[in-house]
Swiss-Prot record:
Pathway recorded for this protein: Lipid metabolism; fatty acid beta-oxidation
Disulfide bonds: none
Lineage of the species this protein comes from: Bacteria, Pseudomonadati, Pseudomonadota, Gammaproteobacteria, Enterobacterales
Family per record: Belongs to the thiolase-like superfamily. Thiolase family.
Catalytic reaction annotation: an acyl-CoA + acetyl-CoA = a 3-oxoacyl-CoA + CoA
Active site per the UniProt annotation: C99 (acyl-thioester intermediate), H392 (proton acceptor), C422 (proton acceptor)
Chief localisation class: cytoplasm
Cellular localization per UniProt: Cytoplasm
Keyword Acyltransferase set for record: yes
Protein's name according to its UniProt entry: 3-ketoacyl-CoA thiolase
Highest taxon, organism lineage: Bacteria
Quaternary structure (record): Heterotetramer of two alpha chains (FadJ) and two beta chains (FadI).
GO cellular component: cytosol
């Protein structure tokens, strides 16, 4: 066991997660069609503050993330402060760590709490796959800049004459890695082939995810942590996630064709996360500040770790890399955990990470560790379903997972939970949380 790194303030206070909330998650171009991420962020933070009954002036910092950036609101965090009636002097800044963005936001607020610069803050993220920054071609963009500098009409017309019809076509946001040109699904296909993960195994995990998420909603386990969203023109509120397929069968999954490697692939739309809209946020405080305000925390942040690997091959192994670090810093092992919540970007990615967490060879030859991190106990793993079922608004997923895990830990009488995710760019994140 390596060095334990206690997450406490100089006064010995633990980092308390007082409450958390999210919007329902909606598939692209459905219930939240036309609602930008900044509005989803304002929606969830405003409701979170209202439900907590914490005076807005208590919140000294807001760190928020958005992966699909909108040029008109580049600092989503500050816009949320200004749009929710919070104190205008509240510090606010935005972060981005791809699919681990709200992990980063939570870590940043925790670090401010440990440094003593604040005593309470909000962290979270929002993304919309329905409101996208549609751009222009590089050639058109350059011509437009030059036209703005041109002095005469003839100069402007000459510049425009260089354009062809194809240069005028809109350019949607890139779905591939900038450095490699590989799509996430291409990487998932790599991982399925590298680790011998079959189509049947992927479909079974996806089916499990949907079944458990549907059961969680049916049992009322998510009601406290998901708000009802009222969307213009306010005719039909959205109270639950709309991606969950509770009535599907394994035979339904088998009907879908591969989405990326269409000839030999096993990754389909059904065993991958869909493009999703939504927002999530949590309130963090020092333990003593929570006591002053008479608040009972959901739980505490015990440790966190971020990692990075190469992007050319099997880059979605973030959980296999970051989990041993987070456990080490928490002074725990896999057997100490009550719950494990892993982001399901793709079923293939999830199964590959599970395999490597239990691999002695991976631990020894790749991580340089004496022993495997530990086998993943299925009875502890994604017990309420995962991202394949709920959906994945990139910047919101981490806050969803942490809030969900803490509520479930409390229902089980407390314990430790691991929350972990892969992210674009070969990044990984893991956090250990504790509930009493």
């Amino acid at each position: 066991m390596g060095q334990v790194l206690p997450l406490v303030t100089r006064q010995g206070d633990r980092i308390a997660i007082v409450s958390g909330l999210r919007t329902p998650f909606a598939r692209q171009a459905t219930a939240f069609h036309g609602i930008p991420a900044v509005d989803l962020g304002k929606m969830v933070v405003g409701e979170l503050l209202a439900r907590s009954e914490i005076p807005a002036e208590v919140i000294e910092q807001l760190v928020f993330g958005q992966v699909v950036q909108m040029p008109e609101a580049p600092n989503i965090a500050r816009e949320i402060v200004l749009g929710t009636g919070m104190n205008v002097h509240t510090d606010a800044y935005s972060v981005s760590r791809a699919c681990a963005t709200s992990f980063q936001a939570i870590a940043n607020v925790a670090e401010s709490l440990m440094a003593g610069t604040i005593r309470a803050g909000i962290a979270g993220g929002a993304d919309s796959s329905s409101v996208l920054p549609i751009g222009v071609s590089k050639k058109l963009a350059r011509v437009l800049v030059d036209v703005n500098k041109a002095r005469t009409m003839s100069q402007r017309l000459k510049l425009f004459s260089r354009l062809r019809l194809r240069d005028l076509m809109p350019v949607p946001p890139a779905v591939a890695e900038y450095s490699t040109g590989l799509r996430m699904g291409d990487t998932a296909e790599q991982m399925a082939k590298t680790y011998g993960i079959t189509r049947e195994q992927q479909d079974a995990l996806a089916h499990r995810s949907h079944q458990r998420a549907a059961q969680a909603w049916s049992d009322g386990k998510l009601k406290e942590e998901v708000m009802t969203a009222f969307i213009p023109p306010y005719k039909q509120p959205l109270a639950e996630d709309n991606n969950i397929r509770g009535n599907s069968s394994l035979a339904d999954y088998a009907k879908l064709r591969p989405a990326f490697d269409r000839k030999h692939g096993t990754v389909t739309a059904a065993n991958s996360t869909p493009l999703t809209d939504g927002a999530a946020a949590v309130i963090l405080m020092t333990e003593s500040r929570a006591k002053e305000l008479g608040l009972v925390p959901l739980g505490y942040l015990r440790s966190y770790a971020f990692t990075a690997i190469d992007v050319w091959q099997d880059m979605l192994l973030g959980p296999a890399w970051s989990t041993p670090l987070a456990l080490e810093r928490a002074g725990l092992t896999m057997s100490d955990l009550t719950l494990i919540d892993m982001h399901e970007a793709f079923a293939a990615q999830t199964l590959a990470n599970i395999q490597l967490l239990g691999s002695e060879r991976f631990a020894r030859d790749v991580l340089g560790r004496a022993h495997a991190t530990g086998e993943v106990d299925d009875s502890k793993f994604n017990v309420l379903g995962g991202s394949i079922a709920y959906g994945h608004p990139f910047a919101a997923t981490g806050a969803r997972m942490i809030t969900q895990t803490l509520h479930e830990l409390r229902r089980r009488g407390g314990g430790f939970g691991l929350v972990t995710a892969c992210a674009a760019g070969g990044l990984g994140a893991a956090m250990v949380v504790e509930a009493e």
